[in-house]
Amino acid sequence: MPGTPGRGVAVKGFEKIVRSVQALGRELSRKAAAPGLPIPAIGLALGGGFARGMAHIGVLKVLEEERIPVRIVAGTSVGALIGAVYCSGLSLEELEKVAHSCRFTTFARWTVSRYGFASNDRMVSFLTRVLKVKTFEDLRIPLGVTATDFNTGKGVVFHSGSIIDPVRASCAYPGMFLPVNIRGRWLVDGMLSYPVPTHPLRDMGAERVLAVHLKGQWSKDSAPRNLFDVIGQSFAIAQDMMGHLWRGAADLVVEPDVAGFGYDDFKRAGELIRAGEVAMRQALPEVRKWLETPAETPVAAKARPALPSPAPMPAD
């Protein structure tokens, strides 16, 4: 009967099956057309944006449905959070459910101090609960997590050891969250050094870099509504000014339409995920071309501009 509640769910399920079959057909066709052709190592760079980062889940959904093999992931701020959970092995279906239940207080608590208005220590219990593994070495997909050394201003990239504190550091918005101390170094949000971590992804061996930029449209004619707007707009301006630095290391930039969402709009997770899906589907034709070309040769790789090296962490 028209209007039956389960009908829409059934239709969506059928559409998902059709897309999966179509993706499998394309994959088999590629293999038949070019047997033994090495597929370039595709890396995914997930930028920051707080609640807007839910759009990353939509991007990942499309990549999985279309069987696009992501070999390496690097994340900044919320991109590090989403990337860590995904690379640990949590299914996208589970990740989407988690996203719908998230609020600001899932990760943080208000605690006014000389260094910030909130602590993201609740992220420890959140990550302990949702991560399938707790160390970089055990991740199913290699992951780089960025942060910024507060004293030197240099970017730091984590690839080994415990995942939880590096993700906390990557999400530590200056002025909002307290800095995170790791091995004697005070670290803050990775967006200050790597708004979208394309350079670390290249250093990790990515031959094709797909960058996801959560471009915010800052207000030019109205006052900010709250602290989130002040800090979020400040970061958006900085990201825009630094765009030429990280875009040069990207082969393709995907920009979900998140301009109408606030940095604390966790309750709109469904809309944000959908925005990521729409943007990624528009970019699919270009990404599919990567699967039809051989992996980058050492000569071609050397032709790229030199990339800045992150500051090393001291040994344990």
Please name every model-derived segment.
Residues 2-74, 84-316:
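Patatin-like phospholipase
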Residues 75, 79:
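Gly/Ala-rich beta-loop-alpha elbow adjacent to hydrolase catalytic centers
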